[in-house]
UniProtKB/Swiss-Prot annotation:
It comes from Homo sapiens (Human). This is PRAME family member 9. GO terms for molecular function: ubiquitin-like ligase-substrate adaptor activity. Keywords: Leucine-rich repeat, Repeat, Ubl conjugation pathway. The lineage of its organism: Eukaryota, Metazoa, Chordata, Craniata, Vertebrata. InterPro entries: LRR_dom_sf, PRAME, PRAME_domain. It comes from the Eukaryota. Belongs to the PRAME family.
């Protein structure tokens, strides 16, 4: 009888599970356990809450990294506590286990195939492939060699209080701060009293943070409390600010002082590459203060749904830190009554690098479009261009399309349905819109072979969404 090639790993799996049932499981036994058995048996122990086995397996863990976050999705605080107890034993004992390799406890919420790879290897006997498919261990360069253990975590502060896992972890870290390094690379603040945020930020090494998102309805006095912490995030690469408002109780003098305190922190952010600001009301008339403090060349700049003055646009076009932009998003900024010469200058500056341009809902009208066409037609790296929500006529749209003809890298183009598509009451006339699309289809294909062009309607009063149509007159989405 021919033996199946899956028989050996299956026998190993059964043998390993019998170890988990052994209440007298000893460290010496685990030190002789084949490396390939650890991941599947660890998952088994975690899901079945074999706490004593977990403590010992952590101490004998044969890899440098323990990516625990995917397993925490199984609600089991008791098992999580057992893992930390096992780490305690490692950190406090004088003599380390012979097999100890663990250096990183990874609690980041990232796509993780570690457990999947080893589980499939157990099922199919492909342990060699599992070893080849392991991801390199992520280190924190700042703390290399200073502490025996680094704990990677992502902080999502979205409720009034932390979840039970993070609460327990931070308390555990606080009590062992001299034995390990807590590294947080991503911080997202979606809603929490600032006094709670402050206590958490005091525990984190701010130099480690690379991405910050603040999406709260903060007024300027609260932003003032956050400002000193921002200045210490010297390795910050991405900053997202959303829904920052000016309190009606703040005088113009106070506003200027607070904005100055905030923007001067950017002088310290020498790694910043991506800056996103959405519904940030204090930018009006103060954009120059922020731009003058930028010390790096940005790759991404999005200023959306904000009120800007014409002078703000002028300062933006003169900023030296925007000359290498790959992404520029100014959607939702009303430009109807402004000269677009600053925007023309801005596009000329970034023409060599710009790949994504979004000018949706800027209120750009026919008489303004010509100002930006020469500069737009020189953005040869552009692959996505969105111009929805701007009330232009058919002739202007055709002119715009004729200027983008030479942009060979354009993959996605989004344009508004021209004004002729609507009736006197502002509702879309479907028959007229279909006729216009047919005319545009012939016009565009006479000029070039587009990869994807979509025409969008105004927002639907019922569902609040736009409808998108391609050149073939088929509805794309609503």
């Amino acid at each position: 009888m021919k033996m199946s090639i899956r028989t050996p790993p299956r026998l190993l799996e059964l043998a390993g599970r019998s170890l988990l049932r052994d209440q007298a499981l000893a460290m010496s036994t685990l030190e002789e356990l084949p490396t390939e058995l650890f991941p599947p048996l660890f998952m088994e122990a975690f899901s079945r809450r074999r706490c004593e086995a977990l403590k010992l397996m952590v101490q004998a863990w044969p890899f440098r990294r323990l990516p625990l976050r995917p397993l925490i999705k199984m609600p089991c605080l008791e098992a999580f506590q057992a893992v930390l107890d096992g780490l305690d034993a490692l950190l406090t004992q004088g003599v380390r286990p012979r097999r100890w390799k663990l250096q990183v406890l990874d609690l980041q919420d990232v796509c993780e195939n570690f457990w999947m790879v080893w589980s499939e290897a157990m099922a199919h006997g492909c342990f060699l492939n599992a070893k080849r498919n392991k991801k390199p261990v992520q280190d924190c360069p700042r703390m290399r060699g200073r502490q025996p253990l680094t704990v990677f975590v992502e902080l999502w502060l979205k409720n009034r209080t932390l979840d039970e896992y993070l609460t327990y972890l931070l308390l555990w870290v606080k009590q062992r701060k001299d034995l390990l390094h807590l590294c947080c690379k991503k911080l997202k603040i979606l809603g929490m009293p600032f006094r709670n945020i402050r206590s958490i930020l005091k525990m984190v090494n701010l130099d480690c943070i690379q991405e910050v998102e603040v999406n709260c309805k903060w007024v300027l006095p609260i932003l003032t409390q956050f400002t000193p912490y921002l200045g210490h995030m010297r390795n910050l690469q991405k900053l997202v600010l959303s829904h920052m408002d000016v309190s009606r109780y703040v005088s113009p003098e106070q506003k200027k002082e607070i904005v100055t305190q905030f923007t001067t922190q950017f002088l310290k952010l020498r790694c910043l590459q991506k800056l996103y600001m959405n519904s940030v009301s204090f930018l009006e008339g103060h954009l120059d203060q922020l731009l003058s403090c930028l010390k790096t060349s940005l790759k991404v700049l999005t200023i959306t749904n904000c009120v800007l003055l014409e002078s703000d646009l002028k300062h933006l076009s003169q900023c030296p830190s925007i000359s290498q932009l790959k992404t520029l998003d100014l959607s939702g900024i009303r430009l109807t009554n402004y000269s677009l010469v600053p925007l023309q200058i801005l596009l000329e500056k970034v023409a060599a690098t710009l790949e994504y341009l979004d000018l949706d809902d800027c209120g750009i009208i026919d008489s303004q479009v010509n100002a930006i066409l020469p500069a737009l037609s020189r953005c040869f790296e552009l692959n996505t261009f969105s111009f929805c929500g701007n009330p232009i006529c058919m002739a202007t749209l055709e002119n715009l399309l004729s200027h983008t003809i030479i942009l060979k890298n354009l993959c996605v183009e989004l344009y508004p349905a021209p004004r002729e598509s609507y009736g006197a009451d502002g509702t879309l006339c479907w028959s007229r819109f279909a006729q216009i699309r047919a005319e545009l289809m012939n016009r565009v294909r006479d000029l070039r072979h587009p990869k994807r062009i979509l025409f969008c309607t105004d927002y639907c009063p019922d569902c609040g969404n736009r409808s998108f149509y391609d050149l073939e007159a088929d509805q794309y989405c609503c």
